[in-house]
């Protein structure tokens, strides 16, 4: 932001409000969220919810490589807030019984995260849809969210089980389970930002957004993940820019 052309004497002009710089604007946005959600703690929990089936290897690598950069950027933007980061890696045990979900609960020990997530590998996935319901179950039942700003970054290249989420899916009973988990996220005022890789997950993301919005909350965003972007730092930029738009 351009500096003011002349200095303002605060005592002489007590009602003058100076323009906020970018950092102050970001803090003001988060303060509004805290006020709207009747919370007072200056804490920010960021959870990565990632499809960890076989086709997602390069995207999991980006998450592994760039967590510390994301942390640094957000700490600079929101210096007054205490951050925690966590991961849920979901697969498809519904259709591929050897698949398991994995999670790393929210922690502020960012320097320890690379060691933990380097063990995560992309594998499994039987049919096209994946077990979103299993992933969101962990989000709601196992992650230890704090009473502050809560954001999920959901990264996927395939939709969810359930005929309302993926046309022709044979596991129709999974849809209502996921419906309830999405509604619970809305009730808990967890902001959800979805990065869709290709067009396959679009129907699932769109239904989830509709359910979320119907709960009176509009903090559910969908945006494309450019598969052609190979630049180091692209994932960091995408995450940080998305967060500054929703907070």
What are these regions (language model features)?
Residues 2-247:
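Divalent cation-coordinating acidic motifs and surrounding scaffolds
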């Amino acid at each position: 932001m351009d500096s003011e052309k002349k200095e303002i004497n605060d005592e002489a002009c007590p009602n003058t409000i100076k323009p906020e710089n970018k950092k102050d604007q970001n803090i003001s946005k988060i303060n509004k969220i805290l006020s709207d959600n009747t919370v007072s703690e200056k804490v920010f929990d960021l959870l990565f919810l990632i499809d960890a089936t076989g086709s997602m290897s390069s995207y999991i690598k980006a998450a592994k490589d760039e967590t510390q950069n994301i942390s640094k950027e957000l700490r600079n933007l929101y210096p007054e807030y205490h951050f925690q980061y966590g991961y849920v890696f979901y697969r498809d045990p519904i259709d591929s019984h050897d698949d398991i979900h994995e999670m790393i609960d929210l922690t502020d020990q960012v320097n320890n995260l690379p060691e933990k997530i380097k063990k995560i590998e992309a594998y499994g996935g039987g049919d096209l849809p994946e077990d979103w319901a299993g992933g969101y179950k962990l989000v709601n039942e196992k992650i230890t969210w704090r009473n502050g700003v809560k954001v999920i970054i959901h990264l996927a290249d395939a939709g969810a089980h359930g005929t309302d989420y993926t046309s022709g899916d044979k596991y129709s009973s999974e849809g209502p389970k996921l419906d309830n988990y999405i509604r619970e996220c809305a009730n808990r005022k967890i902001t959800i930002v979805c990065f869709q890789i290709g067009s396959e997950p679009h129907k699932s993301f769109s239904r989830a957004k509709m359910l979320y919005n119907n709960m009176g909350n509009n903090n559910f965003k969908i945006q494309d993940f450019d598969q052609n972007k190979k630049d180091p730092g692209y994932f960091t930029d995408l995450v940080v820019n998305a967060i500054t738009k929703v907070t």
